[in-house]
C-alpha cells in the first residue's frame, strides 16, 4: 500500500468559506453548542471506536438518556460501554452487534429503541491505496455497500419511523469533494452518500416534519484506517474532540440553516452562522454537485 509522506497541512490549504480553521475543539461547540440531551436517544453506527466513540462520549457528556452503539465487534463495544458508563453513569449504553449493511437488522434495532432523536452515521469502509485497476470487484462492492448503500438504507428506515423530529449526522470525508490519489472508489462512495443526504433533506422541506440532515468532514483524525495510509508524522492531525463537539452543535437548533448541506468540522461555527443569509438565497452553496 502506498503511503503519504508530505508534511504540508494539506487540508488547511483547501479553499473554505470561513477564515478560521479549527484543529481542536473550542468553547463555542464544547459548552455552548445549544444541544439539550435530556431524555434523548442517540444511535451511532461505528460508535465503538475512533470518531464514532468520540461522538458517543460527547453526547453522553451532554446528558442524553440513551446511546445505542451499532457495530460489528462485540469486544470493542464492551470496552466502549465500560469507558462511557464510567465517565457518564447517568447515560444508558445499549449495544447492537451488526453490520450496517444488514438493513433488516437495523430496522429491528429501530423498532426496539422505539424512538431515536439523533442518528449518527459513522461506520465506513476503506480500500487499499492502489489504482482502480488493482482493486477487486469484491473490494468495490464492499466499499459502496458500506459507505453508500447502507447510508441510504439506514436513513430511509430511520426517516420512516414514527415521530416528526429527527436529525441525521452523516460523517463523510473531504474526498467526497475532491480528487484524492488512489482513493477512487472510497471518494466516489462518499460523494454518492452526500448526494443522497442532500436529496433527502430537500424531500422533507415543507412537509411539516422536522427532519434535518447534515453531512460533514470530521477533520484529519488518526484512526487504525488512517494509520494504514499515512506515515508517522506525515499529517497534522486534528483532535478527535473536534468532530465530537461539532456533532453536538449540529444536533442543536442553531444549525438549522445548514440542513441538507456539506460542511467541515474544521470550519468555525460563528463564521458559518455569518453565512446564513447567503445559504438562504443560494440552495447550491455548500453542497456537492456541478460547479459552473
Curated annotation (Swiss-Prot):
GO MF annotation, one: oxidoreductase activity
Assigned EC number: 1.1.1.-
Enzyme class: oxidoreductase
Active site: 172, 186, 190
Pathway this chain belongs to: Secondary metabolite biosynthesis
Residues that bind NADP(+): 44, 156, 186, 190, 221, 223
One family name in Pfam for this protein: adh_short
Keywords (A to Z) from UniProt: NADP, Oxidoreductase
Superkingdom: Eukaryota
Family: Belongs to the short-chain dehydrogenases/reductases (SDR) family.
Role according to the record: Short chain dehydrogenase/reductase; part of the ergochrome gene cluster responsible for the typical purple-black color of the ergot sclerotia. The ergochrome gene cluster produces several ergot pigments including the yellow ergochrome secalonic acid and its derivatives, as well as the red anthraquinones endocrocin and clavorubin. The pathway begins with the synthesis of atrochrysone thioester by the polyketide synthase (PKS) CPUR_05437. The atrochrysone carboxyl ACP thioesterase CPUR_05436 then breaks the thioester bond and releases the atrochrysone carboxylic acid from CPUR_05437.
Protein's UniProt name: Short chain dehydrogenase/reductase CPUR_05418
Amino acid at each position: 500500500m502506498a503511503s503519504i509522506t508530505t508534511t504540508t497541512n494539506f487540508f488547511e490549504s483547501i479553499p473554505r468559506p470561513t477564515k478560521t480553521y479549527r484543529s481542536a475543539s473550542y468553547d463555542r461547540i464544547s459548552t455552548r453548542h445549544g444541544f439539550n440531551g435530556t431524555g434523548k436517544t442517540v444511535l451511532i453506527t461505528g460508535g465503538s471506536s475512533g470518531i464514532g466513540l468520540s461522538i458517543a462520549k460527547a453526547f453522553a457528556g451532554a446528558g442524553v438518556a440513551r446511546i445505542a452503539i451499532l457495530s460489528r465487534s462485540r469486544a470493542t463495544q464492551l470496552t466502549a460501554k465500560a469507558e462511557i458508563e464510567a465517565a457518564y453513569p447517568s447515560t444508558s449504553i445499549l449495544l447492537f452487534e451488526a453490520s450496517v449493511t444488514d438493513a433488516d437488522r437495523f430496522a429491528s434495532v429501530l423498532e426496539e429503541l422505539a424512538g431515536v432523536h439523533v442518528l449518527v452515521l459513522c461506520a465506513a469502509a476503506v480500500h487499499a491505496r492502489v489504482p482502480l485497476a488493482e482493486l477487486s470487484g469484491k473490494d468495490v462492492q464492499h466499499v459502496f455497500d458500506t459507505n453508500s448503500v447502507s447510508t441510504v438504507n439506514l436513513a430511509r428506515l430511520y426517516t420512516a419511523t414514527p415521530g416528526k423530529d429527527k436529525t441525521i449526522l452523516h460523517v463523510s470525508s473531504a474526498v467526497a469533494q475532491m480528487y484524492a490519489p488512489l482513493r477512487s472508489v472510497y471518494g466516489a462512495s462518499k460523494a454518492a452518500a452526500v448526494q443522497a443526504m442532500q436529496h433527502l433533506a430537500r424531500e422533507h422541506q415543507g412537509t411539516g416534519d422536522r427532519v434535518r440532515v447534515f453531512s460533514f468532514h470530521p477533520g484529519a483524525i488518526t484512526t487504525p484506517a488512517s494509520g494504514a495510509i499515512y506515515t508517522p508524522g506525515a499529517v497534522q492531525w486534528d483532535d478527535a474532540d473536534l468532530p465530537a463537539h461539532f456533532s453536538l452543535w449540529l444536533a442543536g437548533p442553531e444549525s438549522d440553516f445548514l440542513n441538507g448541506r456539506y460542511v467541515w468540522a474544521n470550519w468555525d461555527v460563528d463564521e458559518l452562522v455569518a453565512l446564513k443569509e447567503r445559504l438562504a438565497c443560494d440552495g447550491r452553496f455548500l453542497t456537492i454537485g456541478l460547479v459552473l
